């Protein structure tokens, strides 16, 4: 079985061949934690969670190193902390917890490693120092350090933009002490506006903080090395962020290629416009949670359009996804088999005639819309089949395939919703939020809080089961 993935670097679909045939290294640009995520942000996380699942299917999860960073120092963060009059680290810590809660609601696996930018300032300083020594970067009298783009001849390799077109669209201030308009910042000096909110760090160039682009170069290098397999992110990151990452990393490590495959997902739009907070046309993940919408339905809505295409968010697309989830869950219930009862192995699944088309769809550049059609075809066969043994085999295939798409994490949501409402003071989306908060507490080694949450849910008739993969399932105690 071979995975084919579209590589933005080559502008074509390529067979995925990892650097190490037995393991895979993947880096994905994570959130800037100044505010809770909207569903456009969430779509990107779900896309790379699906890729993580497919890679785990092919190579086994323990052989995948998936790094997704947390940007916890940035202009937006500084401005929001000032606006709220709180410590910058309090803001980023609380927002990171909310991000984890929202992604848990959508059934996303935790990455293998989730480094924070502020924990890796030393690595960034070392890389910047190296770039200055090789002549690829320079410092200015006002304390800035810039990367000199003209020193890297392949600067436009990923974006394929010309410097002339970049100049036409440039919004850089002419007052900055840059040698060339396209040079980008590696280090920013501290100023009176940000020194009081802990947004500054010591460096050879004075107090300040790193530029955004150097953060990802440093963290991908620290946790994956000079060369790794896949780098992912939204299409809006192709330029300048990923373009600048390549320049920094290849110059800092001249013998490296950096990432072999560059993968980018399309925007989520509203009436044809990109969803963004600046346009005030956004819907947060929590807005949907408050409507008691199954997170699996939101996830399925994201996957109903190919990851590289724009996805327009509207009531119809969400309702269609909700109906499909209900149809699939009702089909599973009709066979009287539970998710926990499935015992088919990966080997059996790979050779299962019912799922060959499903797998081939996902291996073809993550063609999730086609994979969903395959799921529905399996469900239709289950409903038409009378032979119990054949029906059970089909259902087990449906369970495995649905789990690979990541839409079974809220299976009990539909099954137990009425019981929860009748027997508990906690509603389903609140259960998911509390579970995510408990997982974060365990990661923070706050065992008292983790135990308190378990006890709180238990007192409301909800039993938790911690699984070996780090996730937690729940059920109603009847």
UniProtKB/Swiss-Prot annotation:
The UniProt record gives the binding positions of Zn(2+) as 29, 216, 241, 245
As annotated in the record, motif 'HIGH' region runs over 31-41
Its catalytic activity? tRNA(Cys) + L-cysteine + ATP = L-cysteinyl-tRNA(Cys) + AMP + diphosphate
Q: What is this enzyme's EC?
A: 6.1.1.16
Report the enzyme's class at the first EC level: ligase
**Subcellular localization(s) per the UniProt record:** Cytoplasm
Cited Pfam families: DALR_2, tRNA-synt_1e
The record's disulfide annotation reads none
The answer, when asked if Protein biosynthesis is one of the entry's keywords, is: yes
- Annotated cofactor note: Binds 1 zinc ion per subunit.
Can you cite an annotated GO cellular component?
cytosol
Task: Report if keyword Cytoplasm is assigned.
Answer: yes
Where on this chain does ATP bind? 277
Question: Recorded GO terms, molecular function?
Answer: ATP binding; cysteine-tRNA ligase activity; zinc ion binding
Q: What GO biological process terms are annotated to this protein in UniProt?
A: cysteinyl-tRNA aminoacylation
**Keywords associated with the record:** Aminoacyl-tRNA synthetase, ATP-binding, Cytoplasm, Ligase, Metal-binding, Nucleotide-binding, Protein biosynthesis, Zinc
Per the entry, which co-factors are needed?
Zn(2+)
- Location of the motif 'KMSKS' region: 274-278
Residue ranges annotated as transmembrane are none
Subunit structure, briefly? Monomer.
Recorded family membership: Belongs to the class-I aminoacyl-tRNA synthetase family.
Q: Give the protein's recorded name.
A: Cysteine--tRNA ligase
Q: What organism is the protein native to?
A: Orientia tsutsugamushi (strain Boryong)
This protein's encoding gene: cysS
